[in-house]
Every structure is written in C-alpha cells, then in structure tokens.
C-alpha cells in the first residue's frame, strides 16, 4: 500500500498541499466508542482512556448522567475499614449468600461471587476518582446486612461528577445530543 510520501511525490506537492493540511487537522478515529454517558458508560470511557485508548462517548440526551442521576446511589461492598469500627462483622461469603438470596436463588453463583469479591476494590477506585461516601455503612431496604455506602451527594450525582471528570481528565471526548 502506498504511503503518504509516495502519494505526495506522485501527485505533486502543489496539488495536494491543502488536502494534506486539512487531513492532518482532522481528529484521529477513536479506538473505543461508548454509547451512553450514564454511570456505566462514563466508567467504561474513563477506564479505556486510562489504558491509552482514544475514546468517544455518544450520549443522546443534552447532558451526561443517564439513569444513574435518578438512582438511590447506595453502593454495597464488604468494607472492613468502615464496618469494623461500627462493630459489624462481614465477609465476601456472606455478601455472596445475600446476593443469591435476593436473586431468588436464580442468580449465577459464580457471578454473585465475582460481584462480592470485586465490590470493595471498585469502591476504592470510585473514591480515588473523587466519589465521596458518608463515613458509616448502613442497611437499606432490600439489603440483608449493613454494608451499603451512602453518597455524600444525593442520588447518583456524585458518581456522575467523579466519572465524568475522570473520563475528561484522561482524554475521552464526550458528545451530547447525538441521534
């Protein structure tokens, strides 16, 4: 396949100088395109950009946030750092059992265990991105144990602010009003 230098020589510099300058100004094609700028989309964009990918997020609404903005925002994770000072004994096994019970025993035990094991690390990652939670864990309706982390900001606002900032800081492009 011919390279740019051979094409320039063949066509003559004067006849293609303007198109080459214009081509150089066009943004590179993204490696990753994320559809939706809610919590999951922004998290995917931030992580892909952290790994060096050129990321473009396409959001149909006029602002980021999606359904995460209207969620309760509580985050469940085994968290000895917060639970032990409150006198709460918890474990990955107990969390896994609670997930299976709340799923009416229809949940995949392997996936429940992956969620229970990974929730603590994800909590730390969220906090490293600027997400802030209240200092005590609580038990919420539908939960079986006090392991829920309540955001400092209402609903999902804190998640969106932290993930949106991380995605932008890492170089992701976010486009709203996409049809």
Please give the residue ranges for each predicted region.
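N-terminal secretory signal peptides and thylakoid transit peptides that target proteins
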Residues: 1-14
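Bacterial Sec-dependent signal peptides at the C-terminal "C-region" and cleavage site
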Residues: 15-26
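N-terminal Rossmann-fold NAD(P) dinucleotide-binding loop
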Residues: 41
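Aromatic pocket-lining residues of Rossmann-like dinucleotide-binding sites
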Residues: 48
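Short beta-strand "acidic-cap" motif of Rossmann-like dinucleotide-binding folds
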Residues: 54-59
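Conserved N-terminal/central alpha/beta ligand/cofactor-binding core
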Residues: 60-179
